[in-house]
């Protein structure tokens, strides 16, 4: 039907309904803009935070050049290694009066030890006397340790004098009465073309003619021992000092952190704790096998420090860090990841890293053939921490420590 002439048909418009969607385009625009601002701000903050890390990772040089090495899977802590709390039965002695009594020697009831502030002290009853100092003050800090000196291994010789291994200054003989100090081997002297960098422990033959000692590294000093462990540098040596000719000879080299040393009963060989490798080697220093080396015990449940004779004819081995199984061992995990070691040492100091090492203390008694006899534990290091040596005397075990501010005494009849 045609529209009437002169009239126009108008289509009705739908009423305009106002809703919340009316301003949606404007809201979306605002939201998009705010999101962009947020993302840009977030990315800027992330970049700002990551930039120093990237500089550390790609620009800064790591202080260590780690070597790849492998450790066997740690032994299960069962049987002889079964965890217990026996070290918690120990008594702390001279708390806050002795810092870092690493090694111990005794003449009768009188004990001698070296401390973190460079002193060699004499312990009589409840009294501590400073017997001698080898280095020069100031002492007591990492910065001055290399000039102050750090007495580590200590032994009583057949003539009643003390033989002392100072990490920075060398080998010394000390009169236990007068405190007179005599230098035997200086670290200034080159041995087979290399200086002594980290003199650690020693032992003396029964006739006093030979002193065997360990030089843990020619690259790293004692104050950087974590660098040595992490780098796994194989530059440690076992040396022999002849008290008559004054000559020093290399008995064995290319060891990874040779630490504690103990003469075998026949004195034709010495046991050497190879700390980084969690084992004890036997180095032949005289006789038909001189110059040879074999393994006394492999794959220990911890990292061995000093070795000392036990009254049963075996050996006490102190370990300040363990390789728990079941459990997690940081050093085992990192052994085949040198890139991660480098990164860690770019980011953290040695003191910071030590905080991540469990305070688990462990002392193991081994038979003369290396078989485990028994073990004493303090899993959290609540009483005995950072154990470096177990020294047996008169039915008691005296526990030295490279770091703790005390000495521990354990009654063996009660454990």
Curated annotation (Swiss-Prot):
- Sequence similarity: Belongs to the strictosidine synthase family.
Task: Tell me where it resides.
Answer: Membrane
This protein's major location comes to: membrane
Per UniProt, which keywords does this protein have? Glycoprotein, Membrane, Signal-anchor, Transmembrane, Transmembrane helix
- Note the superkingdom of the native organism: Eukaryota
TM region(s), chain numbering: 40-60
Q: What's in the GO CC field?
A: membrane
Whether Membrane counts among this entry's keywords is yes
Sugar-modified residues:
159
Bilayer topology = Single-pass type II membrane protein
Gene Ontology MF terms in the entry: arylesterase activity
Source species:
Danio rerio (Zebrafish)
* Extracellular topology ranges: 61-412
Please give the name of this protein.
Adipocyte plasma membrane-associated protein
Which intervals lie on the Cytoplasmic side per UniProt? 1-39
């Amino acid at each position: 039907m045609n529209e009437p002439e002169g009239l126009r048909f108008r289509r009705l418009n739908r009423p305009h309904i106002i809703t919340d969607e009316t301003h949606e385009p404007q809201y979306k625009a605002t939201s998009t803009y705010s999101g962009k601002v947020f993302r840009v701000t977030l990315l800027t903050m992330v970049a700002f935070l990551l930039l120093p890390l990237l500089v550390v990772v790609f620009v800064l040089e790591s202080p260590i050049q780690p070597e790849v090495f492998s450790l066997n899977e740690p032994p299960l802590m069962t049987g002889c290694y079964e965890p217990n709390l026996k070290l918690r039965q120990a008594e702390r002695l001279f708390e806050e009066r002795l810092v870092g009594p690493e090694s111990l020697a005794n003449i009768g009831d009188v004990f001698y030890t070296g401390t973190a502030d460079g002193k060699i002290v004499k312990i009589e009853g409840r009294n501590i006397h400073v017997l001698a100092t080898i280095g020069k003050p100031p002492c007591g800090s990492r910065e001055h340790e290399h000039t102050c000196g750090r007495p580590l291994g200590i032994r009583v010789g057949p003539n009643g004098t003390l033989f002392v291994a100072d990490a920075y200054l060398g080998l010394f003989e000390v009169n236990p009465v007068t405190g007179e100090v005599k230098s035997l081997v200086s670290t200034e002297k080159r041995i087979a073309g290399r200086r002594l960098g980290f003199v650690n422990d020693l032992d003396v033959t029964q006739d006093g003619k030979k002193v065997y000692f360990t030089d843990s590294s020619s690259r790293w000093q004692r104050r950087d021992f974590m660098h040595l462990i992490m780098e796994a540098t194989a530059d440690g040596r076992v040396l022999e000092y002849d008290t008559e000719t004054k000559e020093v000879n290399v008995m064995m080299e290319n060891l990874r952190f040779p630490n504690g040393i103990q003469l075998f009963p026949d004195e034709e060989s010495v046991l050497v704790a190879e700390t980084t490798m969690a084992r004890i080697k036997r180095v032949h220093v005289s006789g038909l096998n001189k110059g040879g080396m074999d393994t006394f015990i492999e794959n220990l449940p911890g990292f061995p420090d000093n070795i000392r004779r036990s009254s049963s004819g075996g050996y006490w081995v102190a370990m300040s860090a363990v390789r728990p199984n079941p459990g997690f061992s940081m050093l085992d995990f990192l052994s085949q990841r040198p890139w991660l070691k480098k990164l860690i040492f770019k980011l953290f100091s040695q003191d910071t890293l030590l905080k991540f090492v469990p305070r688990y203390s462990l002392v193991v008694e081994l038979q003369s053939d290396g078989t485990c006899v028994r073990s004493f534990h303090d899993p959290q290091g609540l009483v005995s921490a950072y154990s470096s040596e177990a020294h047996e005397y008169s039915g008691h075990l005296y526990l030295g420590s490279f770091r703790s501010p005390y000495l521990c005494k354990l009654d063996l009849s009660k454990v």
